[in-house]
Swiss-Prot record:
Gene field: murA2
Organism of derivation: Streptococcus pneumoniae (strain ATCC BAA-255 / R6)
UniProt-recorded Gene Ontology molecular function terms: UDP-N-acetylglucosamine 1-carboxyvinyltransferase activity
Entry's localization field: Cytoplasm
InterPro entries in alphabetical order: Enolpyruvate_Tfrase_dom, Enolpyruvate_Tfrase_sf, MurA_subfamily, RNA3'P_cycl/enolpyr_Trfase_a/b, UDP_GlcNAc_COvinyl_MurA
This protein's name: UDP-N-acetylglucosamine 1-carboxyvinyltransferase 2
Length: 419
């Protein structure tokens, strides 16, 4: 069993460079199946989710080369083999194979998605969209079988009953080679959707409106190869900004797109966090006299659900009381019980998190219950006096590229230990 060991209480300073966006690249890689030539991705994060996707692509027949942060994928040899529950179930984003395999082969058999347990994340919206485009869906045990083999996919007008990033992207992927026009209404607006649309358009797709609540896709017959740079990871950036405000004595966060973080930065400014925003970086000063605030997550451009957990340790430094309400994933509260082991004054009731700041944290043995909870525990461990041991760290390595090295470069006493 591997664990992360932190000796906390040290002031950190220096610079961190943000990697490519996890939530983009996990959709970009399956989307490449639609191309009929080589596609190269730049700024690919070194995370286990990418390694798993590469392994799946190779099992399907793709040729993949990786050097540094560049991923070169030749999808011409991909075969439509069933991808049963197993390797697939470790990935929430495995559902993007539904759209790409349907778009290329007219059918797909894929295990149901896994990832972090944050409460219901039904694929009903995905299936509704595929069915509107002419596919049939059936369950075979833990697998989902989709088919439009006889008639092919056709354009459709699709209204998303709930704003969903995954369903919006998946519908877009499936629609780019469908016959006719597809219109997605009440579409999600996240930057990662624009990133996927940019890749697909550079491959020859006709997508308009990505980043708005109405997306229009006119189907094309073929998609060609291209080269694409993954956008910076706004969630990683927000995580390190929180860390810098919590334990930093001056930390610069590089490769940041401020427009992707405006809602998050606004809440930090409400707390009294002092920072300087530049063209592609944010400098976070040493902080004092922070004020407790209330957080309520919302779809983009609101406060991102993926950032409420990494922000929580910083809130525990603030003076006063506050609440955190996650309207997206109601079960995103498991970090509360682990932070309480570190002597945090924090609790949860009826899905609401209640906290009182100002109490010093103490090192403890804690467990990462999901990706962003793990990030919160790393920040808390760096804040705490004494030693913190974090187990279940595979969740953390799923989404944070080179996290140990990046934190060591700031002066953190942190290491990965093999038991």
């Amino acid at each position: 069993m591997r664990k992360i060991v932190i000796n906390g209480g040290l002031p950190l300073q220096g610079e961190i460079t943000i990697s490519g966006a996890k939530n983009s690249v996990v959709a970009l890689i399956p989307a490449i199946i639609l191309a009929d030539d080589v596609v190269t991705l730049d700024c690919v994060p070194d995370i286990s989710d990418v390694a798993s996707l590469v392994e799946i692509m190779e099992l399907m027949g793709a040729t993949v080369k990786r050097y540094d942060d560049v991923l070169e994928i030749d999808p011409r040899g991909v075969q439509n083999i069933p991808m049963p529950y197993g390797k697939i179930n470790s990935l929430r984003a495995s559902y993007y194979f539904y759209g790409s395999l349907l778009g290329r082969f007219g059918e797909a058999t894929v295990g149901l998605p896994g990832g972090c347990d944050l409460g219901p994340r039904p694929i009903d919206l995905h299936l509704k969209a595929f069915e509107a485009m002419g596919a049939t869906a059936s369950y075979e045990g833990d697998n989902m079988k989709l088919s439009a083999k006889d008639t092919g996919l056709h354009g459709a007008s699709i209204y998303m009953d709930t704003v969903s990033v995954g369903a919006t992207i998946n519908t877009m992927i499936a629609a780019v080679k469908a016959n006719g026009r597809t219109i997605i209404e009440n579409a999600a607006r996240e930057p990662e959707i624009i990133d996927v649309a940019t890749l697909l358009n550079n491959m020859g797709a006709h997508i308009r409106g990505a980043g708005t609540n109405i997306i229009i896709i006119d189907g094309v017959e073929r998609l060609h190869g291209t080269r694409h740079q993954v956008i910076p990871d706004r969630i990683e950036a927000g995580t390190y900004i929180s860390l810098a405000a919590a334990v930093g004595k001056g930390i610069r966060i590089n490769n940041v797109l401020y427009e992707h973080l405006e809602g998050f930065v606004a809440k930090l400014e409400e707390m009294g966090v002092r920072m300087t925003v530049s063209e592609d970086s944010i400098f976070v000063e040493e902080q004092s006299n922070l004020k407790a605030i209330n957080i309520k997550t919302a779809p983009y451009p609101g406060f991102a659900t993926d950032l409420q957990q990494p922000l929580t340790p910083l809130l525990l430094r603030a003076n006063g009381r506050g609440t955190i309400v996650d309207t997206i994933y109601e079960k995103r509260v498991n970090h509360v019980f682990e932070l309480a082991k570190m002597d945090a004054d924090i609790s949860t009731t009826n899905g609401h998190i209640l906290y009182t700041g100002g109490r010093d944290l103490r090192g403890a043995s804690v467990k990462a219950t999901d990706l962003r909870a793990g990030a919160a525990l790393v920040i808390a461990g760096l804040m705490a006096e004494g030693k913190t041991e974090i187990t279940n760290i595979e969740f953390i390595l799923r989404g944070y590229s080179d996290i140990i090295e990046k934190l060591r470069n700031l002066g953190a006493d942190i290491r990965l230990v093999e038991d």
